[in-house]
Amino acid sequence: MTHKILPISIIYINKEMLNQRIDNFMRSKFKSVPKSMIYRIIRTGKIRINKKRIKPHYKLKIGDILKIPPIKILCDIKNTFFPLNHSTNLLNRILYEDSHLLIINKPSGIAVHGGSGLNFGVIEYFRKLRPLNKFLELVHRIDRDTSGVLILAKKRTSLVSLHEQLREKKIKKEYIALVHGLWPDHIKKISEPLLKIQFKNKQKMVLIDKKGKPSETYFQIKKKFSSSTLLSIIPKTGRTHQIRVHALHAGHPIFFDKRYGKNDLDADIKNNHKINRLLLHSSGVHFIHPKNGNKIYIKAPLDIDFQNYLNTII
């Protein structure tokens, strides 16, 4: 481990930064600085706006002058390695790009962002690959083990617009999943509240519980096989692990779901077919383009391993 001192920073707030909370702005601007340190230097008044102390919830205004003191951080030299194979793979998986948006077909097994022992996620890879992009943020998240459509915003105005569409449920996401067993024809919608809990070992689980948040998922049968069903799925809400938990609730967990699946059945299939990934894929997304107002529909083809497994059971 070694120390690095970030120099004094003076930042002039423009319209791209407008209405951001100062704590969120600092966390996005200084990603290598621990969150606890950011809140400490705000609370102690070391961060000043227009020469005045501010609260963590202060929202930035155009013309504000932000002064940030020198910050001493720890750097782990071993963790700066940037895997070239992943970065090349991600560049080959771009589905759509313009001056406002970057949309990729995320592979299974790569997290959308670093943390919890991970040095790099999709957003860190693209920030390294696109150093001239001054702004690049995730519009939404999908699970590490889920593949498919992932939207990144290249401008803050685009991020704000798409977040508003998410809140107003104007963005429609489509998924494909292979589940165990024969899905009943009558189950077309599951509306069960979901509660997220965390254990002492920091492992997180989502349970169906009346104290949870309202959640709604629509299911349509695409094809039934001898002992499995391929489903088209549309989540109306965007809760953590929503599709996976609702599928389990119906008695038909998704193939190779290490947290909510049937490990005994999955183990036999892994040995026979050499596949070991969650068979859940974000196959498409509908939204309104944040700049020109056009209706956009982006489709993401199935990964080769997912498609190859389907070919073996047809």
UniProtKB/Swiss-Prot annotation:
Origin species: Buchnera aphidicola subsp. Acyrthosiphon pisum (strain APS) (Acyrthosiphon pisum symbiotic bacterium)
Active site residues of this protein: 143
GO molecular function annotations of the record: 23S rRNA pseudouridine(955/2504/2580) synthase activity; RNA binding
Sorted UniProt keywords: Isomerase, RNA-binding, rRNA processing
Function noted in UniProt: Responsible for synthesis of pseudouridine from uracil at positions 955, 2504 and 2580 in 23S ribosomal RNA.
Keyword Metal-binding listed: no
EC number: 5.4.99.24
Name under which the protein is recorded: Ribosomal large subunit pseudouridine synthase C
Entry-linked PANTHER family: MITOCHONDRIAL RNA PSEUDOURIDINE SYNTHASE (PTHR21600), RIBOSOMAL LARGE SUBUNIT PSEUDOURIDINE SYNTHASE C (PTHR21600:SF92)
Gene name of this polypeptide: rluC
